């Protein structure tokens, strides 16, 4: 403690390896890391004014499992990415327009190819994103197979594409 404020603390696994550490970086920012029993980083959380703003979770092999970054003043995320143990993506969500809370979203096949992609918009009434515009769907080889047009988060129309259309 320094002047009544927690500055640093550490917890340890039963075998003596570091399990968790917290550091106050300054009066506003702090950082917490947790570790797997094998010593690999498990998670890292960055705080601003006591609120988690960035979080990264790791598999025990060291690969990133999940990464998120929250908007500092709005109730939505700027980024949410999910990965497989081999490091290949499962899904990604990245803000492309903060003013309209619009995101580029993609989902991936186990082989790493894009399964579908399109845009989504944060809906404050649902406290979640919903798909908007045209979404493209791909087969495992990466060929675009069909498109869906979304209106208010619901499929409005489906457009099949030719089997050989890239």
Regions found by a protein language model. Name each.
Residues 1-166:
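Glycine/tyrosine- and acidic-biased, solvent-exposed loop/turn segments at the edges of beta-strands
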